[in-house]
């Protein structure tokens, strides 16, 4: 029979329920010892009758507990955990008391194993006192400190576990803390915060505990016939006496041990009123009377302290395994009884008032309690233990029918029944067969199915079956989603070997929601149907109620309730006839027993109480109405009708007022919208989205297509320029030194390795020597060049590094410009970008799409209003727009600061899209001009208008000529005519150059062209600037090196000359001192008359003007013209004069003179085809006369007469001026540079050409070694070197590839005044300045006389440049 107290018990193996001895009195017939061994206890099928404690009146149990041979009392009901076993006599074993009143829901924590959770629960129950639900901090700290962890670690564990921050731990929090302790003990790191899964499980567990309300005994006893007995506990209470009898019977058992047990008192049965929900069933002892109940006897007091543990049984027999029975339930009928079987089967549960004392019967503790959950009942050893929850309260009283079995299990499970006594077939084989890795034949599974036990397979799913089905589900649900897809389920069910129609029917029944996948409950239903089919049972057409999952049932009930409420309403529900469904513990309600009766009277009308009285109000439906009553009713109806009419009129008036009010509000809103539109039109903010998109597309095409390409091209040009510079220098060096191999740096290294190979040590030594030479040269002021190729390699290396650095600098400038363009792009894009919301709003509110007809009509009206107002504003502002355009054009032509300020002032007043476009362009132009201004760049149109300085320089030019010949003073009538063309022609050229540049306007095409022109201008500027700097560096370095070499050579030659020359040299320079003394006077006199111009130079001026007009074309827009004028134009340099006067000197003869003097050739070096000595390769050398004068001056003895004291000073002055003139001519490619400084006009430079003969005397002072015929020659030779300080310029270097004209001559003479002249002297004769052509003949005579000199030595190429010895050790900048 099914016992409601046994539904929490797991099945056990057949156990003996007691021991029968020979001397046991025979009351009711009882089964023998051997028969007892075969008893199977546990859950029975419903057809078995339940033996109950309460027997009928015709059957009175008569069991005597006074004799020794009485059956041992068995534990019934939920027991406390007590140690069992044999205890020594007289000594009580220590006990651990659990708090059985603690309510802990049966919830499984996934991160803790089931075994650990049981241990933690046991520890928690022993640590929590009664009446509490949580363990306090002190008790928890005592337990946690036993782990041996540090306090810091325990503090972290506590902070993680105490989720509610209450200072105490509920069971899930306590279990979490112990789990974290075990993790820390294993060496695993503690998490910084709880994983989300853990936290959710713990919080759900805590909520379940918090929501659970302890059951109140008064509520349980309410509305039951036992409520009146809740407070009675008299001496004649048979349950109390029975408890004492039980203890005495245990004490006087045949074991002779003292008291039977010290069990904690447990409430068993229904009499005591205490709930059985939280009790836990355990191994039970046999009931007091197995086959009969005896009358209560006098209790026997125990003679000694109760034993803490005791095993059932006695003597030398094998002790029984602990058997678990229900509370206060007699032994189950497990076989035929030799007594009154029919009477026992017909026993009904009743109430015996004398059995109340059984309420206090103590139960024992078995140490195998935890293992009991693993024991199986009957023949099934594979059943898993099911966690049990609180028992449902049963109605008590005299019940003629036996109690029905109640479902138990974890929350979310349904209708589980216990495994039948005989077991069910093939369940174990099914578990092994359906696992994923199992590959067993189907015949093995089908052979174990069926048989005699197939009748035990019920519709309901047993606990064991459910556990097996869940295990199979978890094995196949690898993704842990809680679902199994159709294809996976097909693989699982196909293992059964069933036919396809059967599997389709099973799937249809299981997949109730038709989702194509099964959850855990639906999978269990499908597996149970498969199991039934394998046992030969038919598949039902509809799912039976026992197999409907609780989740589906609850959902369906809720849906039915909702449908009923929606269909009939809540008020139409009959509460009196409604069925109150009994809710079980699986729903975890706070108090499931408190349903609270609600009377249906609350839905009745309050006036129903007076309905039965006499009616005082007449109605038209009454049959006994008089005439007066009818008249009265008519008046009342008229009054009601009038009231209704008045209400209707008021409603109509109110509606009209409200409608008019709404119309007024709408008109007001329309006027406000029009005002806003007018404001937008006046400010130019009403541009449509299409225009913004168009402008944004143009911006993207410029910034994402054109600008990146231009920048990449600029970078490429920079790299090409750097490489070209290096290659150009390499070509020049190779031209000067044909034997130099730039690819081989080891030509000068002497190898010490095998076969003369150069080793790494040799290279390091060579580098160290070269470095030492360079340092010594830097300290002593001497050159480190020893005639080897190392200097050439070093120069090439330095030039390569300079080219790279310049390329990097230019790239940085380009990057700055790129960043400024990016800023402009971002600023414009923020104003032009539109969002999806704006686009959708534009479709709706600008085109009237997707809105009501009235609103669409207003939108169209607003568009027409905006268009008309836009035209009016455009007409009104047309003149102002033109004026603003003109003003903006004028302001753009101003410097960058004024240009940048103009768009800001105009940006606040643009009103039309055209004005806005002009504003955006002005903003971009402003930012670009600011960036260019920071870089020192100004636009071409700005430079054209804002550059009025060159004409003033040309006008001021006649005031600064350093010298003028006295002979040409009479021919000075034409200077005003000659001065006027130079300022006019450059200006006209500039105007012509500006014509291709477009004027400033508001069109986007012009903006694009302007932007492209700016970028082109910037690129040209960078390229020319790089070339200029590179040429300057190269020339400066070459000049320094060669000057140092010349100083060394001069010193060496002076030493040799002093040792070799005779002391009888003739002082042929005596007459020249008078000439040199007279030169300053001529200079001073010429300075006083600046307007004088030579007549001879007139034709030369007219030929030079076109060249100089063509030259500035490439650099009219150069913003650096003013800046370059200062560094490049050394106004104090008297040497920069036009080179056209060099035509009076034969360069071939001068070259032959130098070669003969230095002994470069065996045929005396007078060849006309010496390419290595061309003047183009020596840009820093002066003319032939200058070289001869320097040579003669350097060979003169240091201290022979007093005159050489003036010669070094003059030579120093000349060399300084020469260095300055060379520095001004450092950029030969400036003629085609857009941004180079425009050259001055030719006439201003030609005017200073005549003073060539004025400084004839000072140069030939150093010519004593010349033979006797030499003295007249120096008087004629100096015209050329004299022009050096005032008008001579070095020969121009090779022009760049696209030379538009001759190299520009810096405007140095227009700067500071020339240096102060020496003391004045008598003016030279006129013939000295006019007879320039005879100079070549005199030089030829001089060269013919020099041919006889054999003392001159032939030098190498590195020593071919000489200079004054006064410049030794000085650094020229």
Swiss-Prot record:
Coiled coil: 1007-1066
SMART domains on file: EH
UniProt GO BP: endocytosis; endosomal transport
EF-hand domain boundaries: 149-184, 498-533
Domain of life: Eukaryota
Positions of the EH domain: 116-205, 465-554
Entry keywords, A to Z: Actin-binding, Cell membrane, Coiled coil, Cytoplasm, Cytoskeleton, Endocytosis, Endosome, Membrane, Repeat
GO MF assignments: actin binding; calcium ion binding
Compartment(s) of residence: Cell membrane; Endosome membrane; Cytoplasm, Cytoskeleton, Actin patch
Start and end residues of each stretch annotated as Disordered: 271-362, 385-409, 562-622, 739-758, 876-914, 931-1089, 1103-1335, 1349-1373
GO cellular component: actin cortical patch; endosome membrane; plasma membrane
UniProt biased composition (Basic and acidic residues): 581-590, 1019-1030, 1038-1056, 1139-1149
Disulfide feature: none
Comp. bias (Polar residues): 389-408, 571-580, 739-752, 1070-1079, 1118-1134, 1154-1166, 1357-1373
Pfam families in UniProt: DUF1720, EH
InterPro entries according to UniProt: DUF1720, EF-hand-dom_pair, EF_hand_dom, EH_dom, WH2_dom
Compositional bias ranges of the Acidic residues kind: 1057-1067, 1167-1177
Compositionally biased tracts (Pro residues): 1250-1326
Membrane topology field: Peripheral membrane protein
Primary localization class, coarse: membrane
Family: Belongs to the PAN1 family.
Subunit structure: Component of the PAN1 actin cytoskeleton-regulatory complex.
Protein name: Actin cytoskeleton-regulatory complex protein PAN1
Source organism (scientific name): Scheffersomyces stipitis (strain ATCC 58785 / CBS 6054 / NBRC 10063 / NRRL Y-11545) (Yeast)
